[in-house]
Amino acid sequence: MRMFVQDAGELDALRAAAKTTVTALLAGMHAIRPGVQQRIVESVVESACWNSGAHGTDFWPWSMSGENTVFPRDFFSLALYDHLNKEMRAGELVRLDVGCEWQHYQGDLGRTVPVSGHYTDDQRETWNIFVAAYHAGAAVLRAGVTVDQAYEVWRSELLRHRATAKSALAQHAIDSWSKRENVPFWQIHATNLLAARPPAMLPAGMTVNFEPIASVDGQGFFLEDMYLITKEGAELLTPGVPYSAEQIEEEMLHASRP
């Protein structure tokens, strides 16, 4: 259990890693636009980590777009030579998943971002439902809760939107993601020196990442934040990053584009 629970010094390092990671993710978000190369966005993230005082990235940034956001192509995009770079195109979504390293401790944070700066109507509805489910799941995180319990709350919130979902994409997403076997990479993982599978019940004092990963109709949806588990709940360690489609569009609209 000790490997999962951080002492005060370790938590200070994780807080610093989280803070610099927020800066790096926003920098990456601001660099995304039609025609930009995946590698350019990744280099912006790497530079932002260093410029904010971190020791670079703790893993190579993920900024896959389009079909490369869907398993297994997202992993291929990291590992195979013919998928290592791609020009981003309007209408695509980007999986932006980044982390800065501070004194060997990991930051880890992510959002799903529209290349054009605007979601399509069906992407917007689907993403906002995904976000609502995320917030519901995050709200139950506390000491003693299991990963399966958090998933069931997330799932229940998805299903609550089924009757009012308007687009075929959102309806298909809810029907698919509400079956556990269709979201095999939906996860909560421990974060400190390395990412790791958490114990059966989350202990107080552990830093975790809440990271639902899902896809539907060739589009990936991904959201991730860092939390400190306490007896009363979970403290968000990565505040300051927009969630909803409208908030993300506003952030991208007012970004100073390179």
Can you say where each PLM-predicted feature lies in the sequence?
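Active-site neighborhoods and metal-handling regions in enzymes and metal-associated proteins
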Residues: 1-258
